[in-house]
Amino acid sequence: AACSSPQPPLVASDVEITRPMPGRHMSAGYLVLTNNTDAPIRIDGATSRQFGMVEMHETTVEDGISRMREIEELVVPANGSVTFERGGKHLMLMRAQNLEQSVSLQLWCNGAPVLSIEYAFPDEPN
């Protein structure tokens, strides 16, 4: 028998959260969500102690015009992944509060936590 524990159902990798610009209270989050189960996983919300509001958004280009729309519900396919990246799906983190060296994010489905993510900002160059 294998001595390893089973993989968690949902995993976040390549996490990057931008530090808000001085005087601004908004940030963006990028990551890859991987579903290790045989069933799709729904995500219908996100929260953070360091931001008053977190939304999932998607940037699309129509007729040469870039538009951003909110994603009400995201489905991570069974044994698949979804990428949040610049110019595509991303997290909008708004109303920064108590922002220090790290950010904790929670992803939700029907009011139940699906995944918790801790992200530490890289040290700023001197």
Predicted regions and their residues:
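Compact, glycine-rich, soluble single-domain proteins
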Residues: 9-126
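Bacterial signal peptide processing site
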Residues: 4-6
